[in-house]
């Protein structure tokens, strides 16, 4: 009887195994540049290949025996099949993240984008549209396809900073569309883009190159109108023509009104049917009027989007500023507060010149040495190209920083991230780190990571064991003890998927209770961004803020259409801002409508502070969408007695029209009120903007600034709870604060700057340190003081802090501090890349 060859059996098994392993997900992870196979033809081919391999394997296993296979045939066959199977196993392991892909080091992305400019966000589409336009023109100069490609190319040229060329090609598209008698709606879309292009030309000249303190603040004042109004008048004409054919379009109405503002013809120059009256955006509450002084202080880097920290890095009693930018060739900027009303650039002195890029940054003290360290978050929005490592920068006693990412164990992983936050989740006295993973492909997400601090300068990644992998597209992270049980819970804001509320079980594990507590779903599309825990109504229970992010998709409308429609009272199908109030039993209810936050504003960066020292947290939102037509103001909401929020943007003079990202509150001049620093800039390589510092003029309300010093707990007191009892107008009230840096996109000072309203004495302050369980109470404290509370100490200490007058020039302003030039940046420029010898960084 002829026996079946064992070689054929093994070959059959290997073929079947190869058929299973070589699926489209594994092959995409192994071979595709974006780690995903999406073309239908390729998907069909892979499925057919899998079927052939599996059927061939079954045939070899089941075919009748026909004698032995010669070794010189069987051995090479088995080796080949083993190689194919091994490749399939490796590809599958890579897809499932069992094999970590190569991590990009800091200089790599800069070098890549310098040599291959098409790698920059939006640049590849410019090349693609140019090639398609050439193909369309080869057939006909005025075909419908040619018009479509010219319109699309105009948009991509704007993103690239080629504004004049964009205007020229859009004008050609308009003439061709008219000649072909294309539908009015299609002609109007070209007019709309021509209006945007003409406004962009003026925006670059007046808001960036000739930047002044009020040149970009909404509503544009008569003192800030453009000197060269040509672009504004051209834009008005296109917008008026659009509205004659399609009256009522919210985005075009909005842009027509803004164009009139910047030309100095608002409101009289706007047709009555299209006028957006000042009452639409006017403030109804009295509010201190800020002045923007960043440029005159030399702390306004002209950059792409990035993060910001306001804190005292050298422990001299004055708050410094650290800024990052998405540009992979520009280093962090460290502006030292000199204590005399001016700032010095300490970037080089602190050894930060090699720390380039960073969509977001935050401060920490991971080793409890009393020196603030910096964590840099990288790779956001870049999907698989964003597998570059973050950086943990340890501050040394001499004020320099050392990159300890690898030696700490944080450098072993790299996923794109925009949000990472610190807290002592296991109450062992040191700060742990949660890093939110982003989308890698259309169907694949990065795991989020929880790094437990080992107390010796190293970390262990424990997300899977703790139950917080998330596997969604994270855009915001917040730690806070929502149930007042003494341990830190975790809220995760996911873009396009339900959010998570991970309850800390007290045993180093978490349970997602978001759905049952009603804080997971944000209708209609679960698109949210920045988030935080705060006590919005001072009842001693932490509430949740999470900002809806209305972007292109879902409704099919661009950002400005949604935001403008909301301003005009028109219905929108988009996410609004949300606040979930804690009812004191650990449950939440959506109070967004009652508190007047149910509006579409599309913020990325956001944070909270107390601008009027009334003891209730206010909110500043930085509108950060990528589109050039998103000329909507950043927003300041004042908290009115914990009952509702009032939009006081125009009264406060803080409605910057350029794209905002990192937002940081802090008392920069030590005068007792919180100033606001906003990192400005977009994501497309020409969309650079000067950052802003809004100086608070103050009110008559009183305040207390508390510096926490942990002993058994983490040194900066992150997560510690502060309760003040004051008597205001003859009535006792409580004011609550929590140690930390505020929201998830921008970092406030760790010192707690607490307003106490009209109270002239603080009857009692209580500080609760959850890690140790220590509760300290002190009575009869003076107001308008800086104090230090050290964990376990018998008394507090008054700190001597000198108030200073910032040397800003107010409305006049001056030129922004020069920065390393960016791709297509205005003002004559160098693309990102290695700097010439002797060149100074950011």
Language-model features: where?
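Gly/Ser/Thr/Pro-enriched helix-cap/hinge segments flanking short amphipathic alpha-helices
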Residues: 644-646, 650-659, 664, 668-835, ...
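Short, conserved, GDST-rich strand-edge loop motifs in beta-rich repeat architectures
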Residues: 204-227, 377-387, 436-444, 548-572, ...
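Blade-edge motifs of beta-propeller repeat domains
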Residues: 268-303, 335-356, 391-415, 447, ...
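Beta-propeller blade termini
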Residues: 305-315, 336, 358-371, 417-427, ...
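N-terminal alpha-helical interaction modules that lie
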Residues: 83-185, 189, 200-222, 226
